[in-house]
């Protein structure tokens, strides 16, 4: 028997394996264009999540940047500054 999915999954779609097989191309297009993951439920196996490669790479990069506690602290501090309108705009070096 498959696992029970949480009642509320914000910003996620869910489809059965059968529907996913029938509408694979459309689901892949939606996942890539909307950047909203889709859960594919299976009767006797654990569910899987389909996300775009772009979103996966973004998650991996975020995890990498937050791995270092010092780097994570600096990033969180910078985010707070931006949220409080204390950010400084700078030109990028090429």
From Swiss-Prot:
GO terms for molecular function: DNA-binding transcription factor activity; sequence-specific DNA binding. Signal peptide: none annotated. Gene3D superfamilies: 1.10.1220.170, YefM-like domain. GO terms for biological process: regulation of DNA-templated transcription. Belongs to the phD/YefM antitoxin family. NCBIfam families: phd_fam. This is Uncharacterized protein ssr0761.
């Amino acid at each position: 028997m498959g696992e029970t999915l949480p009642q509320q999954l914000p910003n996620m779609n869910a489809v059965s394996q059968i529907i996913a097989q029938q509408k694979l191309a459309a689901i892949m297009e939606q996942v890539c264009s909307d950047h909203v993951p889709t859960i594919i439920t299976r009767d006797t196996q654990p569910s899987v999540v389909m996300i775009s490669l772009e979103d996966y790479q973004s998650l991996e990069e975020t995890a990498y940047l937050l791995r270092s506690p010092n780097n994570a602290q600096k990033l969180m501090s910078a985010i707070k500054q931006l949220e409080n309108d204390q950010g400084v705009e700078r030109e990028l070096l090429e």
